[in-house]
Amino acid sequence: MSGSTGERPFGDIVTSIRYWIIHSITIPMLFIAGWLFVSTGLAYDVFGTPRPDEYYTQERQELPIINDRFEAKNQIEQFNQ
C-alpha cells in the first residue's frame, strides 16, 4: 500500500450503528417518495409523457406511426389534431 487517504474503511462504516439508524430511515423514504411521484401523476407532468388514458382519443384509435422522417413534424401535428 502506498498510503492512506484518511477515509474510514467500508467495513467499519456498514457495521456502525449510526449508519444503520440513518439508512433505515432514508432508504424507505426514497421508495415512498418514488411511489408518490408516480402514483400522483407528477411523473407524467415532469417528463411530459401522456397518461395511459391519453394515448388514444375517441376520434383517433390507430397507432401514430411516423413514415417519413423529413415530414415528421407535419405528421406529428396531424396526429395531435
From Swiss-Prot:
It is a single-pass membrane protein. GO terms for molecular function: electron transfer activity; heme binding; iron ion binding. The chain crosses the membrane at residues 21-35. The keyword Secreted does not apply. SUPFAM superfamilies: Cytochrome b559 subunits. Its main location: membrane. Gene3D superfamilies: Photosystem II cytochrome b559, alpha subunit. It is found in: Cellular thylakoid membrane. With its partner (PsbF) binds heme. PSII binds additional chlorophylls, carotenoids and specific lipids. InterPro entries: PSII_cyt_b559_asu, PSII_cyt_b559_asu_sf, PSII_cyt_b559_CS, PSII_cyt_b559_N, PSII_cytb559_asu_lum. GO terms for biological process: photosynthetic electron transport chain. Keywords: Electron transport, Heme, Iron, Membrane, Metal-binding, Photosynthesis, Photosystem II, Thylakoid, Transmembrane, Transmembrane helix, Transport. The keyword ATP-binding does not apply. Its cofactor is heme b. It comes from the Bacteria. GO terms for cellular component: photosystem II reaction center; plasma membrane-derived thylakoid membrane. Heme binds at H23. This b-type cytochrome is tightly associated with the reaction center of photosystem II (PSII). PSII is a light-driven water:plastoquinone oxidoreductase that uses light energy to abstract electrons from H(2)O, generating O(2) and a proton gradient subsequently used for ATP formation. It consists of a core antenna complex that captures photons, and an electron transfer chain that converts photonic excitation into a charge separation. Heterodimer of an alpha subunit and a beta subunit. PSII is composed of 1 copy each of membrane proteins PsbA, PsbB, PsbC, PsbD, PsbE, PsbF, PsbH, PsbI, PsbJ, PsbK, PsbL, PsbM, PsbT, PsbX, PsbY, PsbZ, Psb30/Ycf12, peripheral proteins PsbO, CyanoQ (PsbQ), PsbU, PsbV and a large number of cofactors. It forms dimeric complexes. Belongs to the PsbE/PsbF family. This is Cytochrome b559 subunit alpha. It comes from Microcystis aeruginosa (strain NIES-843 / IAM M-2473). The lineage of its organism: Bacteria, Bacillati, Cyanobacteriota, Cyanophyceae, Oscillatoriophycideae. The gene is psbE.
